[in-house]
Each structure stands twice: as C-alpha cells, then as structure tokens.
Amino acid sequence: MKQILVTGCRGQLGNELQLLAPQYADTCRFHFTDREELDITDRRAVFDFIESHSIAIVINCAA
C-alpha cells in the first residue's frame, strides 16, 4: 500500500483531498497533517515523518 503525506490538510485543497481519499483506501494510505502536527519549515521533522511512516509521495497543500 502506497503511503501518501498531505500537508496543509485544513486548507481548501487539503479538505477536498480528505473527501476523495476514501475512494483510494484499497491502494493508498493517506497521512493528513496540519501545522500543529508537522511544521513543514522544520526540515528534520519532515524527513523524520517521511522515514517513520515510509512515505512514498508528498502532496504539499500548505499555504
């Protein structure tokens, strides 16, 4: 199963992706994060998250 990180999940695009995600539940596992969960300006935190969750794809919806 492909692991996908979506940043900025509280914005308009992030919200729309959350609505679509269940359609892909059989092939993809989405990890939706907001600023409190993952500060994308903290490079080390981002790389740690990617590594610890085996993320294959990052979709940046953060403004």
Sequence positions of predicted segments:
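Conserved NAD(P)H cofactor-binding loop of Rossmann-fold oxidoreductase domains
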Residues: C61-A63
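A short beta-strand-loop structural module common to alpha/beta enzyme folds
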Residues: R29-I40
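Conserved Rossmann-fold cofactor-binding substructure of NAD(P)-dependent oxidoreductases
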Residues: L38-I59
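Generic anion/oxyanion-binding catalytic loop in active/binding sites
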Residues: K2, R35, F47
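Short, high-confidence coil segments that cap the C-terminus of an alpha-helix
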Residues: T27-C28, I55
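N-terminal Rossmann NAD(P)H-binding glycine-rich loop of SDR-like oxidoreductase domains
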Residues: M1-Y24
